[in-house]
Amino acid sequence: MVERQIAARGVHDPRVLAAMRKVPREAFLPEPMRDLAYEDAPVPIAAEQTMSQPYIVALMVEALLLQGSDNVLEIGAGSGYAAAVLGEIAGHVTTVERIATLADAAAAKLAELGYGDVDVHRSDGTRGWPAAAPYDAIVVAAGGPQVPESLKAQLKIGGRLVMPVGADQQAQELVRLTRLGEADFKREHLGDVRFVPLLGAEGWQQPEPAGRTAREKG
């Protein structure tokens, strides 16, 4: 999976590749879906969500430019898989999930696998998690109309934020914001993606009809 799906498509950070090799992707999937764990595609989990394809997880993690001791915030825990990958590289990970069943399952699985440096919270991810701020890096596993101001405010000067952003729920561009100053952000385009809508006070208020948006989440 790592060489064919990830390294061959341009992800080269050795720490990211090592984390993708180490974390047992199948452990975060329902038993009937485990044979699909290493396919180059999203895989259904629960609550009508999916685990993102391996390449997308690796791409977003690499784009955070992690240094090894980073304080990281993830919005959209999903299965907990991406948080585990982050946990292999960062110093501490806080992940926020709005769907209670997913948050509970992710917390249990991460604890079972020994990821004690990953904290899972059930909340509105568009508001971030101020209690553990500021963050060196923030990654958002859902697409919103814009980057929430609460997330920008919780990013350290010099910090990086990676998120899918789009004017509707059909498709987004993956962007990286780097905070250069109190109100100064550099924006970079990383590619085109499709993700589940980011629902919440600073995101979309409701999803579009089922079937119209690709549903990807960590």
UniProtKB/Swiss-Prot annotation:
Q: Report which residue ranges the record marks as coiled coil.
A: none
Q: Which reaction does it catalyse?
A: [protein]-L-isoaspartate + S-adenosyl-L-methionine = [protein]-L-isoaspartate alpha-methyl ester + S-adenosyl-L-homocysteine
Say which enzyme class the record assigns. transferase
Q: What is its EC number?
A: 2.1.1.77
User: What is one Gene Ontology biological process annotated in the Swiss-Prot or TrEMBL record?
Assistant: protein repair
What this protein is reported to do is described as:
Catalyzes the methyl esterification of L-isoaspartyl residues in peptides and proteins that result from spontaneous decomposition of normal L-aspartyl and L-asparaginyl residues. It plays a role in the repair and/or degradation of damaged proteins.
Q: Which family does it belong to?
A: Belongs to the methyltransferase superfamily. L-isoaspartyl/D-aspartyl protein methyltransferase family.
Name of this chain's protein: Protein-L-isoaspartate O-methyltransferase
Give the taxonomic lineage as stored in the record.
Answer: Bacteria, Pseudomonadati, Pseudomonadota, Alphaproteobacteria, Hyphomicrobiales
